[in-house]
Amino acid sequence: MSWRGRSTYYWPRPRRYVQPPEMIGPMRPEQFSDEVEPATPEEGEPATQCQDPAAAQEGEDEGASAGQGPKPEAHSQEQGHPQTGCECEDGPDGQEMDPPNPEEVKTPEEGEKQSQC
């Protein structure tokens, strides 16, 4: 008996053809006018007042958190340097521990030889 396993090679799937927007038809701006332009408040109502009480409460919470300082920015800086568990090799201190390049380091004897020529 021979074992017939499933092949690991998969044929590429045919791509579905989608017509470009020019072929479908022009977009009508009046369909999206509510989404594109924000609703303008009436003259009697202030622009910052929300009609939804839950949304108004969220707005107050945002104002309170804004006075606490730049905590999100400080947190984003910490994410810039991921911790790998072995911090001793990472960072600028690890670069100073490398041995100097012998081509860049000149001994006093080499300096004297060049000055004599």
UniProtKB/Swiss-Prot annotation:
Region (Disordered): 1-117
Family statement drawn from the similarity comment of this UniProt entry: Belongs to the GAGE family.
Note: This gene belongs to a multigene family expressed in a large variety of tumors whereas in normal tissues, expression is restricted to germ cells. These genes organized in clustered repeats, have a high degree of predicted sequence identity, but differ by scattered single nucleotide substitution. Their sequences contain either the antigenic peptide YYWPRPRRY or YRPRPRRY which is recognized by cytotoxic T-cells.
Acidic residues bias spans: 32-45, 87-96
Composition bias type Basic and acidic residues, residue spans: 103-117
Regions annotated as coiled coil: none
InterPro entries assigned to the protein according to its UniProt record, in alphabetical order: GAGE (IPR031320), GAGE_fam (IPR008625)
Name of the protein this chain belongs to: G antigen 12B/C/D/E
